[in-house]
Amino acid sequence: MILAFDYGTQKIGVASGNELLGTATPLKALPCKNTQPNWDDIAALLKEWEPEALVVGLPLNMDGSDSESTVRARKFANRLHGRFGKKVWLIDERLSTREARERTGIKKADSRVDSMAAVIIAEGFFAGDAKVF
């Protein structure tokens, strides 16, 4: 069991993933306050789901370079590891939001898109595209 996160400064999409089946399910999008995650909400998810590992999407630029969002996502991953002691994997999530919009048919900002992006991040992890943090 893993939890995958699509980190954003307004919302964090979350999905659960089953490694044996290679499937993921969207859970929810957690709201952020002043660009900061609500750590109590994240702690509650970890307690409920008891994941073996966490996967965070890394929003790289199209040329593979880091952006301001990449730096924030790495910081989020670092804090997840520091606070909860879980193994955290990073995965290139370029175009995951675009694919999530295509899958859901939702074009505007919507929490369902964020949690579907987390599903895509989990699927990438199952495909072997992740790097350990």
Curated annotation (Swiss-Prot):
Keywords: Cytoplasm, Hydrolase, Nuclease, Ribosome biogenesis. One of its GO terms (biological process) is rRNA 5'-end processing. One of its GO terms (cellular component) is cytosol. It is found in: Cytoplasm. Pfam families: RuvX. Gene3D superfamilies: YqgF/RNase H-like domain (3.30.420.140). This is Putative pre-16S rRNA nuclease. It comes from Alcanivorax borkumensis (strain ATCC 700651 / DSM 11573 / NCIMB 13689 / SK2).
